[in-house]
A protein has these predicted regions:
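Mid-to-C-terminal alpha-helical segments outside catalytic/metal-binding sites
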Residues: 1-26, 30, 43-50, 58-59, ...
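Catalytic pocket-lining loop regions of alpha/beta-barrel enzymes
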Residues: 3-14, 118, 132-224, 276-290, ...
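Histidine-centered catalytic micro-motifs
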Residues: 27-37, 150-154, 181
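Divalent metal-dependent hydrolysis catalytic cores, especially in the metallo-beta-lactamase
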Residues: 32-33, 37-39, 46-70, 91-97, ...
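Generic structural signal for hydrophobic
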Residues: 51-55, 111, 142, 167, ...
Length: 398
């Protein structure tokens, strides 16, 4: 792998991220994993801590992957995570992963007694619905223990909004973190749960447009930075969150809340902050070349994740050609830096060792392309109604 190629292409994005990050702001990654997944991906403690260092992240929540040794009841993966977090000198906050079909209350109680400070549920991996009889028990356990539940709400699932919303509204004291910007049902979930005082949304997703829409629908105080390693990187996930937060017009205090302060307050027992109004419906206006570069480059990401390298390279080639287009315009500097990142990413895809840095560059290039133009409020759509103002939940701990 050509390390210098990666470093040179990365430099302007690092400088941009430093410019956007509020001084002295804590960075807290709400969604990370340790261990082994059935799909072959894995992450060990030193690597995760190194990735957090690269992002300047102080702390992170962590839980098991879909471990091949998860039977029975995720007990072995949960114990491993508890051991690793004990070795992290306080940087990692352990969540236990529960399977609703395998004694979830007994395993949850066992893990909470051993120091777990949250619960992870994955309805796609564990193939469950939120209308099952065991779900009220899990939510009641979290309410009583005053710990949050992080729920996979990303790709690969049928609609979950109605069952999850009904369940959450029966448990008004529970704190939920809906992962991946709740893209599986974002519109319905954000609408039905607007008045629930304890629903957060994490930013771990690939497409910036999903986050742009989330910031329009949800108060900034209910959005928390997350990166989902080993599938994402904390550093590039933070860059995406910073770019979209700035694009949404957030000030430094609000951005600081998104990237760390809200999660820090939750796990430290200081409660969730009161909410402001959502930013409201907006139009996303990109100049032609940026729109084309974004479109082609964003198609390369899923192809790379799926191992379809030639397909990804084809999309990268098209995006690079757009960035080389000499037409005049006010996005020249951005397109030059985006193009350099995509050229480097294309070269790095030629080796297996280069795929991870290639994805990092691609992720950042897509984030910048989608957020380079200033946001504009729609002239035809009214603002999305704000959630009811929520009082700080000083008794809520994780």
């Amino acid at each position: 792998m050509n390390a210098a190629l990666y470093t040179d292409a990365l430099a302007p994005f690092l400088a941009d991220g430093k410019r956007l990050r509020p001084a002295n702001a804590e960075v807290f990654d709400a969604h990370t994993h340790l261990g082994l997944d059935e799909d072959g991906r894995s992450l060990d403690l030193p690597t995760l801590l190194s990735q957090l260092d690269d992002a300047g992240a102080n702390r992170a929540c962590v839980f098991p992957l879909h471990d091949p040794e998860r039977k029975p009841a995720y007990s072995l993966p949960n114990d491993r995570v508890l051991t690793w977090t004990d070795e992290s000198e306080g940087r990692l906050i352990p969540f236990c992963r529960l399977d609703p079909a395998e004694a979830p209350l007994a395993e949850g109680e066992r893990c909470l007694a051993k120091g777990a400070r949250g619960i992870k549920l994955h309805p796609r991996a564990q193939a469950f619905a939120f209308d099952g009889p065991e779900m009220d028990g899990i939510f009641s356990l979290a309410e009583e223990a005053k710990v949050p539940i992080l729920i996979h709400a990303g790709r690969g699932m049928p609609p979950i909004a109605d069952g999850l919303a009904d369940l959450a509204l029966r448990h008004p004291e529970v704190v939920l973190i809906l992962a991946h910007a709740a893209i599986c049902d974002q519109g319905i979930l954000t609408s039905r749960l607007a008045d629930h005082p304890g629903v957060l949304y994490d930013t771990s997703c690939f497409f910036p447009i999903d986050l742009i829409e989330l910031f329009a629908r949800v108060p900034a105080e209910r959005i928390v930075f997350a990166s989902d390693p080993p599938y994402g990187l904390s550093s590039s996930g933070l860059y995406l969150a910073l770019r979209v937060a700035a694009h949404a017009g957030l000030d430094e205090e609000a951005i600081g809340g998104v990237i760390g302060e809200t999660m820090a307050a939750l796990v430290d027992g200081r409660g969730l902050p009161p909410v402001s109004a959502p930013r409201g419906a907006q139009q996303i206006t990109l100049p032609g070349r940026l729109a084309r570069a974004y479109g082609y480059a964003s198609l390369a990401g899923p192809a790379m994740f799926a191992g379809a390298v030639e397909q990804a390279q084809g999309m990268l080639d098209l995006a690079i050609a757009v960035c080389r287009d000499p037409q005049p315009g006010d996005s020249g500097e951005a397109l030059e830096e985006i193009g350099a990142a995509l050229i480097a990413a294309r070269a790095l895809t030629e080796s297996k060792q280069g795929m991870r840095p290639a994805l990092d560059l691609l992720f950042r290039a897509v984030a910048r392309a989608a957020t380079e133009a200033p946001r504009s409020r729609s002239t035809t759509e009214p603002p999305i109604p704000p959630a009811r103002d929520a009082l700080s939940r000083s008794g809520q701990t994780a």
